[in-house]
Amino acid sequence: FGFMAPPTSEVASNHPDWLTQKQDGSQTSIGAGGEVVWLNPFHPEVQQFITELVLEITTQYNADGIQFDDHMSLPSEFGYDEYTVALYTKETKKAPPKDFQNPAWVQWRANKITAFMSQLNQSVKAVKPHAIFSISPNYYEFAYKHHLQDWLTWVRLDSADELIVQVYRSNLESFVDKLNRPEMQEAQQKIPTGVGIMTGLRNNPVPIQQIKSQVQAVQEYGLGVAFFYYESLWEYAPEPLAHRLSQFS
């Protein structure tokens, strides 16, 4: 889950000091996966924990690479825990702004995550130089403003080998709008760049025609495609399996 974890998880229970919080002291947010807590990406012990997990996968298993999704981030409401407040105050000589979307406050936190991702990439390459370091964030404006993920800078700093941008939209015009962005074109010139297409959820199946239309749009922009996710592509579908399979032949 990146920095996101279930509140009852072992890591959250054993290391309450690793959790960050909102201004009101609350430590949870509600998302598609229910209620979650967030590990503090600015805390050195959290960074070490994540790094060790990633290096274990890289060295102990025959993995071609590793991918970090939109949860390798932090919702911008968070960062008001004691450790982060002290760090920000030490570096800037002032307390964090009450406005969690204050541009300087957003940039400071985003820069810290960027620095960690650069360090993590270097750690992976040190033990497995040809491992693919893949990232799968949301489209840039949302990722940066709401999740402190400055993934365009990650690409510019050579901290990513592959980019798969999640564009989970049912409206084709809105979907295409996210493809036709300068940051997508810039990334595409530097590393393999693709688009994540939503193929459905258990309670929200997606018609194959919508998937086909989006794939065609992506191909027109010369981008790659990844589907989220395997089971919904074939099993939780409004059409018979044979029909969906036939659309890929």
Language model feature labels by segment:
Residues 20, 40, 107-110, 156, ...:
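Intrinsic disorder/low-complexity segments enriched in polar/charged and small flexible residues
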Residues 11-12, 84-91, 241-248:
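Generic hydrophobic, helix-prone segments enriched in Leu/Val/Ile
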Residues 25, 29-32, 38, 95, ...:
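Amphipathic, alpha-helical segments enriched in basic
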Residues 45, 49-195, 220-222:
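Active-site neighborhood of glycoside hydrolase catalytic domains
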Residues 6-12, 75-78, 143-145, 172-176, ...:
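Extracytoplasmic/secreted cell-surface and envelope-processing proteins
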Residues 3-6, 72, 140, 169, ...:
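Conserved beta-strand edge residues that scaffold enzyme active sites
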Residues 2-60:
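Active-site-adjacent "subsite" loops/lids of carbohydrate-active enzymes
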Residues 159-175, 182-249:
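Substrate-binding cleft of secreted/luminal carbohydrate-active enzymes
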